[in-house]
Amino acid sequence: RKVNIGMDEAHLVGLGRYLILNGVVDRSLLMCQHLERVLDIADKYGFHCQMWSDMFFKLMSADGQYDRDVEIPEETRVYLDRLKDRVTLVYWDYYQDSEEKYNRNFRNHHKISHDLAFAGGAWKWIGFTPHNHFSRLVAIEANKACRANDIKEVIVTGWGDNGGETAQFSILPSLQIWAELGYRNDLDRLSAHFQTNTGLSVEDFMQIDLANLLPDLPGNLSGINPNRYVFYQDVLCPILDRHMTPEQDKPHFAQAAKTLTDIKEKAGIYAYLFETQAQLNQILSSKVDVGRRIRKAYQEGDKESLQEIARQELSKLRSQIEHFHALFSHQWLKENKVFG
């Protein structure tokens, strides 16, 4: 009977209405007092609690960061010593590309408690397209650190930030990778097991990331999401053009659309994922340079080119987006209740 009580990212705890009514208090102590109250309720109903650990570090580090050394005030230490056996702290981290970075954070956690779990991430929260490649990179390093620190429980999160645009089943490679690491501690059988489970090779399935895999992006960067910023940018207000290189990005998206269309034909029950991504990449290929060409034609007074872009290219782009809307709607309703 486990329950996760959250309590993460409470950056303004003690600074709102509470501050007006009660004045300044040690915020880490306030967290402990509230935690004790919640644990008392959980105990009453026979639940063991887990909670995200980040706020203890953000409240007790000098600069409010998760990955810094902490100095625990004595009054807070008394509370923590009393509570630490009643709650499992979940160290969540979806970003680090080296084992040592995780190890450093585990060492900090051990200052508070040894009842720890770890939460890694299957990246599906940066737009319409997942990032299984980055998920794999960080999973391998996190798994090493979890084993080195004798962590017995690992959670893999797949958050739905900003509208849950990424398909639920698009992160199957990430889940299989974590399963292999968890049960075997290697990826030697990843391809065979993934083929058995899905009917598709993991190499093919990983191509679902293509809208995020621009040729010049280092593999260890997280949160870079051309699938979203190219899609949403206003063609008449191209404020993100500095992040685009049309001469390489346009053919990349065009080839990605073709690759994903080919994979769709052998993807079986997952074909809808690749059809949606193929259409998205077609849109990105059409759109990535059109704003620049509109501005260039406007500055040069080239009304003929402007008319051609408006009547042909933008009309085609609108049709592509309408088709994507239909595909995305089908994908959404296949995986979710209508409101998510």
What spans do the regions from the language model cover?
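Substrate-binding groove of N-acetylhexosamine-processing glycoside hydrolases
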Residues: K2, I20-G340
